[in-house]
Amino acid sequence: MSIDRNGEMSTDQKKFRVITYIDGYNLYFGMLAEAVKRGTRDEPSPSWYRYMWLDIQGLAGDLLLPSQELAKVKYFTSPISTGKGKQERQNAYLDALRTQPLVEIIFGRFQPDRKECDKCGHPAYHPQEKKTDVNIATNLICDALEDQYDTAVLVTGDSDLVPALEAVKRLTPQKRLVIAFPPNRYSDELAGVAGGKPIRIWEPLLRRNRLPALINRQALPDIVCPAKYSGAPGCTRPFNQNPLAK
């Protein structure tokens, strides 16, 4: 049983169940790259920063065919441990995603990566995201084996996930795999192993799927879109409606 695009509970077995798997940082950095392209590295375009406040359940719903229904959206990310502003923005966004009934957040972690400075030779430590690829691969394969979906939509441009897709095709050949590439992300390997025509996520899809500027949680404090992500007016969809309803 799942929620259809009109917000109704559906038991229609003729609908093909879809789980969407979103590589959070691959999507984020794809949008950030576009913001830099349209502005500068020091001053990225604010019109693209606003898409960081993204309604991923609505986006996943927009990728469906009429014969499909959205069963779940799995969002893979890692908690930021440095930079107060970055932490506050991420926390606000994750709180917003937690209000969406079909979204599940799955965490990896950041690990310090030691590198020597090219100029002075002194060691420097940069955070390196860990476990995201493994988490996506594990969920993709296990969900296929447990018959949790008919079609898996994978939002990423990371070719490290090719072996996981190959495993799904080998173990459950009846499952359909679809790749949806974030902005500025593409992999011939991913497109080839999935088969079929990949989806390209660009501005029209992002523009129509911004979260509301204010999300009311009744007993909990309201969630306010961070100033950096406010950009210009975006989605005006009332949040008490199903975000998949257009």
Where in this protein do the model-derived segments appear?
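Domain-level signal for Mg2+-assisted phosphodiester chemistry and nucleotide/NA-binding surfaces
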Residues: 2-126, 176
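Nuclease catalytic cores that cleave nucleic-acid phosphodiester bonds
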Residues: 104-246
